[in-house]
Amino acid sequence: MPKRTRFRKQHRGRMKGISYRGNHICFGRYALQALEPAWITSRQIEAGRRAMTRYARRGGKIWVRIFPDKPVTVRPTETRMGSGKGSPEYWVSVVKPGRILYEMGGVSETVARAAIKIAACKMPIRTQFIISG
């Protein structure tokens, strides 16, 4: 979540089209690319990162290419309609098809493929493993 934001609450918005930014490998050699649009929560991002780090152990470096900068509000349960918008409950990253989620470098392809596959299982969307070059 961001350190500070201009406004506490945001509109939900909609996810049209494909990702034109953040859709190329920049840092590592291997990457996980989204194939569907979705909101990915900060917990899902962290779970994927931890799974990759644990699998790769001391080898390699991991880059997380998405950041949860959108607050999602939730109303208390059994509350009547009206009386304003709910309070921010958690943070999400808006991901469109083509967006790179994670990158990995400094390891062999077999290790990277296995680590990224574990991270992909933590994601709520279909993804694909890609190699730069």
Curated annotation (Swiss-Prot):
Keywords: Chloroplast, Plastid, Ribonucleoprotein, Ribosomal protein
Entry GO terms, CC: chloroplast; mitochondrial large ribosomal subunit
One Pfam family hit: Ribosomal_L16
Compartments, as annotated in UniProt: Plastid, Chloroplast
UniProt key word Plastid: yes
KW Calcium (keyword) present: no
Tree of life domain: Eukaryota
UniProt cross-references to InterPro entries, sorted A to Z: Ribosomal_uL16 (IPR047873), Ribosomal_uL16_bact-type (IPR000114), Ribosomal_uL16_CS (IPR020798), Ribosomal_uL16_dom (IPR016180), Ribosomal_uL16_sf (IPR036920)
Stored HAMAP family: Ribosomal_uL16
Family of this protein: Belongs to the universal ribosomal protein uL16 family.
NCBIfam families associated with the record: rplP_bact
Quaternary context: Part of the 50S ribosomal subunit.
Protein name (record): Large ribosomal subunit protein uL16c
Species this chain originates from: Liriodendron tulipifera
Upper classification of the organism: Eukaryota, Viridiplantae, Streptophyta, Embryophyta, Tracheophyta
